[in-house]
Amino acid sequence: MISTLSQRLREHLAAVYGDAVSDGALDRWVDQLLNAAQLSAAQSPPPAHRNLWDETDVAVITYGDSLLHGEEAPLKTLHGFLTQRLGALVSWVHVLPFHPWTSDDGFAVLDYSSVNEALGTWSDITRLGVDYRLMADLVLNHCSSRSAWFENFRKGETPGDDYFFSPDATFDTSHVVRPRTSPLLNDVATQQGERAVWCTFSPDQVDFNFANPAVVVE
């Protein structure tokens, strides 16, 4: 029986990465992830299969700027609308991408550590989370081709030089099916020469390489 959060996390990572990560590296990885999440290794894991919502819950899904009111920050306007007009009728608020972005209505993230200034601040996000259960689109599968991490990939610098999936010419993509007309692999100029990067959605959305433990920790 898994009694601690660290044990459960270790089990999940071992199931995904198998022999690709040594036991010692796996233990260090678990510690890094728990520290990053500010969680205790001895903390009990959440109950399995516990529903976080039921038929009585009502969720609002919205972009950060779906509601505008003069010069007020859109996230403040959203909070005011929810608390004054909807109140306790709503239990969940799902905010679509609110980070700085370059394309695809927020789904090509430039910087995960900040809130788009055109929408508001982290305080506005926190305020929503105080009054409602908060959900957000973190967009963890890819980031903007103009992000600092991808610029570092091009320059061969850290962090970022090994954050992106860059298959070689022998990689078989013949079984990949995707509802897109843009190329799956895009060639980019780097310090090491031209390299192909995996772009599931668009050339501006470059996929992360989660085979690299550093990406998961980041």
Name every feature range the model reports, one short phrase each.
Residues 2-217:
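Acidic/aromatic-lined carbohydrate-recognition and catalytic surfaces
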